[in-house]
Amino acid sequence: MNKALVTLLLTLGITGLAHAAGDAAAGQGKAAVCGACHGPDGNSAAPNFPKLAGQGERYLLKQMQDIKAGTKPGAPEGSGRKVLEMTGMLDNFSDQDLADLAAYFTSQKPTVGAADPQLVEAGETLYRGGKLADGMPACTGCHSPNGEGNTPAAYPRLSGQHAQYVAKQLTDFREGARTNDGDNMIMRSIAAKLSNKDIAAISSYIQGLH
């Protein structure tokens, strides 16, 4: 096989694996269906629905793809991400649609939340220091000191996220109800080391982090 053909095949392979670029303007029109729960600009008013505004584009796209796969009728146990409230919501969206939605919500400005003053100290200790005696690293390593996350690595933005939603996700990771954190099970292994009090404190701290 000549070098030119090899190069062509490699190029086609790489192109086939690449995700379509999202169009924020197109995503705005497609986001109307999302507004009832997540707010028109991705800043949800209900504490059980996550804020999407300002979230990392790669992370948002992956979560939507996982939720679409995990909520399909007959989806194998452990596949994707199962979110009961999202059942059927993404079925008619193409990969390009999802990319456009991710681009739109990423472009929106997130609102700032507030932490419970009584939980700030405990939450800050966990977020910035982890529980080293138990082998739990600080959250700052992946999610950054100010909670902005790591966009290239698809680690989510946490800053200002609703405490109720964060607590639910940590609990789900701890109990194995959410499993889309990769083969290394990083969030499941971390959440396994958190008590209910730990989860309440760190979730509240994250809500006020900015």
Curated annotation (Swiss-Prot):
Pfam families membership: Cytochrom_C
Changes after translation: Binds 2 heme c groups covalently per subunit.
Statement: the UniProt record of this protein carries the keyword Iron: yes
Keywords: Electron transport, Heme, Iron, Metal-binding, Periplasm, Signal, Transport
Residue positions binding heme c 2: C139, C142, H143, M187
Superkingdom of source: Bacteria
Disulfide bridges in this chain: none
Binding sites annotated in the UniProt record for heme c 1: C34, C37, H38, M86
Record-level GO cellular component terms: periplasmic space
Leader sequence segment: 1-20
Family matches, as SUPFAM superfamilies: Cytochrome c
Described purpose of this protein according to its UniProt entry: Diheme, high potential cytochrome c believed to be an intermediate electron donor to terminal oxidation systems.
Protein name: Cytochrome c4
UniProt gene name: cycA
